Design a protein with these regions (language model features):
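Asp-based, Mg2+/Mn2+-dependent phosphohydrolase catalytic module
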Residues: 2-206
Length: 206
């Protein structure tokens, strides 16, 4: 789950030292969303929720980005604004008059750990919008569309590896894939305290 095109994600992985043979097969949630947007909403004005680092997602149709949420046809959520990265109440106020618009969420993750810092992701904003009565179209794990676009799994065995029970493991279970949980990730404190069986049931992954 990354709210940017696959080519941008591959560059990041290259800088991290990932083997070329592996990273060439990377497919991002942003790429899945981009495919949908180009087919269905290419000429529509949109309001972007997210930081400037995600602008690569809509470079091909950046002229349709509007700074006025009232003038937008749909909402494109890639994350949180840099100056409003922790206060979800800000988004409740911002979105309350746009419940009739569709939101495209390019990263269903609710949160991510970056080093010792925990950050909110696009999924947290999308969840608030849904609870307010809005409609959200998700791209990324655990939703099937990203798997359908990324994997030709006919006759193949698939192993889904990740640290997030809400997305990585839930997505694998929905599609009947084998999965491997990285226990030293976002749920590490819960798993250490309660055990994986209890925690996985709490997140309704099984």
């Amino acid at each position: 789950n990354a709210p940017r095109p696959s080519k941008i994600v591959k560059l990041s992985l290259e800088k991290m030292g990932m083997n070329k043979e592996i990273r060439e097969n990377v497919y991002s949630s942003g790429e899945a969303a981009l495919s949908y947007l180009k087919k269905n909403l290419l000429n529509k004005n949109f309001y972007h929720l997210g930081p400037p680092k995600d602008f690569d997602l809509f470079l091909d149709f950046k002229e349709n980005k509007t700074s006025s949420i009232e003038e937008s046809s749909y909402l494109l959520c890639t994350g949180l604004f840099e100056k409003q990265s922790e206060d979800l109440n800000y988004y409740k106020e911002l979105l309350k008059e746009s419940i009739n618009k569709k939101m495209i969420c390019t990263n269903p993750d609710l949160l991510v750990d970056k080093g010792d810092k925990r950050e909110l992701c696009a999924g947290s904003v999308a969840l608030i919008f849904e609870k307010m009565g809005g409609k959200v179209l998700y791209f990324g794990k655990p939703f099937p569309e990203v798997y359908n676009q990324a994997i030709n799994n006919e006759g193949k065995k698939v192993l889904s590896i990740g640290d997030n029970l809400n997305t990585d493991i839930k997505g694998a279970n929905l599609l009947n894939y084998d999965s491997l949980i990285i226990s030293n990730g976002v749920h590490k404190d819960e798993i250490k305290k309660e055990g994986i069986d209890v925690v996985s049931k709490k997140y309704e992954t099984v």
